[in-house]
Amino acid sequence: MDTIAIPALNRPVDATVEIPGSKSITNRALLVAALAQGDSTLENALFSEDSEYFAKCVEQLGIPITLNPHLAQIQVSGKGGDIPAKQADLFVGLAGTAARFITALVALGNGEYRLDGVPRMRERPMGDLVTVLQNSGIKINFEGNSGFMPYTIYGQQFAGGHFRLKANQTSQQLSALLMIAPYAQQDTTIEVEGTLVSQSYVKMTCRLMADFGVDVTQTDDNQFHIKAGQRYQARHYTIEPDASNASYFFAAAAVTGGRVRVNHLTKQSCQGDILWLNVLEQMGCQVLEGEDYTEVIGPEQLQGIDVDMNDMSDLVQTLGAIAPYANSPVIIRNVEHIRYKETERIRAVVTELRRLGVKVEEFADGMKIEPTPINPAAIETYHDHRMAMAFAVTGLKTPGIVIQDPGCTAKTFPDYFTRFFKMIGQ
């Protein structure tokens, strides 16, 4: 297995970094551009395993896409809600967003569409989304367990109507239904039962739909109404840098007492993970905001924090990786749903922190991390890109940290380690 040794620094980080476009925005923009009538250009798009699986699936459905990674540009020739392909065998890898968005998209088609992914993808929850589609009259044939990949969807134009949806494990299913709803045969109302996790991603979806010309009415926190007959407008759209991926570079400033500036990303971002800046401020960092950048300056000593991370749950690993360097405990709450991500993320973070000698208490929905001197260790990443990226930051302050399977970052940030080593001057 490949490994990367992280060099511990005896000085603060001092760098300005450029971060590729947001994965979440790239995938949403790609879907609505595919549904729009005409040509859209997506600038600063993310090119990674996840986004490329998604783009390939859309192209297999008969919607022309031109990828230009050198310009970070995607051109989409939308078909106005039509799915030209009448049959497709679609593979999504481990891309949960692609899996859910493509599942919803083919419901607008009139054909036979098989979806599958890697073994871990077959374990990730799809049940509530496919149940809604079945309740709308769409036939789905499951090859294994009901509600899980692989399955074949027999598309017939999504009927719309009133649906109830559980979104306590992922909000991606809700986002998927929202984005196809304008092309339903009748108005659509989606009522979320119970807790809606990762609400910030749903807000992102609604904002992007509005940017492409479609309105969503939200009557309360858990009910959404979309009028049928609305249509996305093809357009030129610039995608902002990925706030989740920026978190690792800001964290590097935090643990080394240094300075990191990220261009083209501000607190006005539509991404929920921009809340990471608030967490760092509470831990003692200084956050400076310019017209088109954000800069984090780390303190001499990080402070502990007790934080609900439900709306920025992709950053649990980032906080976990720097928590041992705080002067008091770090408590992470309300993220039980991350047990169903690329890996069982709560257990993975707890296991690797204990491997480093850190005292950690695991909860059903989070963990408590005590300030602890860190021992050298090789970090298991569980094929999870965020484990690799987060624990690389730990190694900036403790000698002897090695990241196993660093190539797993290709899922969302293929050149992460190139940019990471450039940041630290190596």
Curated annotation (Swiss-Prot):
It catalyses: 3-phosphoshikimate + phosphoenolpyruvate = 5-O-(1-carboxyvinyl)-3-phosphoshikimate + phosphate. Keywords: Amino-acid biosynthesis, Aromatic amino acid biosynthesis, Cytoplasm, Transferase. It is found in: Cytoplasm. It comes from the Bacteria. Phosphoenolpyruvate binds at residues 23, 96, 124, 172, 345, 386, 411. 3-phosphoshikimate binds at residues 23-24, 28, 170-172, 198, 314, 341. The active site is at 314 (proton acceptor). Its EC number is 2.5.1.19. PANTHER family: AROM/DEHYDROQUINATE SYNTHASE, PENTAFUNCTIONAL AROM POLYPEPTIDE. Belongs to the EPSP synthase family. This is 3-phosphoshikimate 1-carboxyvinyltransferase. It comes from Trichormus variabilis (strain ATCC 29413 / PCC 7937) (Anabaena variabilis).
